[in-house]
Regions:
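Switch/communication elements of ASCE P-loop NTPase nucleotide-binding domains
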Residues: 1-124, 139
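Aromatic (Trp/Tyr) and acidic
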Residues: 127
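Conserved helicase/translocase motor-coupling segment
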Residues: 131-142
Length: 142
């Protein structure tokens, strides 16, 4: 990554064949390398990641939240997230491709994190079915 003046890295579905903990470690590694390349060259580098994994979104949200926590207590923040893995909210973009094929911005300006509710819709469906099956097994709550 350090050979060029700046880097544009595209990664498709990094979650493939990785457990959730490994997904988070991979995102931290990628962000650390991109930040290091930017620092070393003085030129902005970037990464584009396509994903359908809520774990990847959550990993990015941890790094985004760390940027806010860093302003309150940097030393305590660095014990949780490495300094060179932190992402300022202004440095990230996140989009969802709608059923109509258009891009929808899923950044939540208020909490300064990635929304991603669209990605986790499958979890809602599973939870609804589990709830219905619990009703069958244990009777409906009255």
């Amino acid at each position: 990554i350090y050979t060029y003046q700046n880097t544009r890295l595209v990664i498709e579905e990094p979650e493939q064949n990785l457990f959730p903990e490994s997904q988070q470690a991979l995102i931290n590694f990628i962000v650390e390398r991109i930040n290091a390349a930017t620092c070393q060259t003085g030129k902005p580098s970037s990464v584009v990641i396509t994903t359908h994994s809520p774990y990847i979104i959550t990993a990015f949200n941890v790094l985004l939240k760390a940027a806010r926590a860093e302003k309150i207590d940097a030393e305590a923040t660095y014990k949780v997230v490495p300094k060179n893995a932190i992402i300022p909210f202004s440095d990230i973009r996140a989009f969802y491709i709608t059923d109509e094929g258009t891009l929808s911005n899923i950044l939540d300006e208020e909490v300064q994190m990635i929304g991603g509710m669209e990605l986790d819709h499958a979890s809602d469906i599973v939870e609804d079915k589990l709830s219905l099956l619990n009703d069958v097994m244990y009777g409906q709550a009255e």
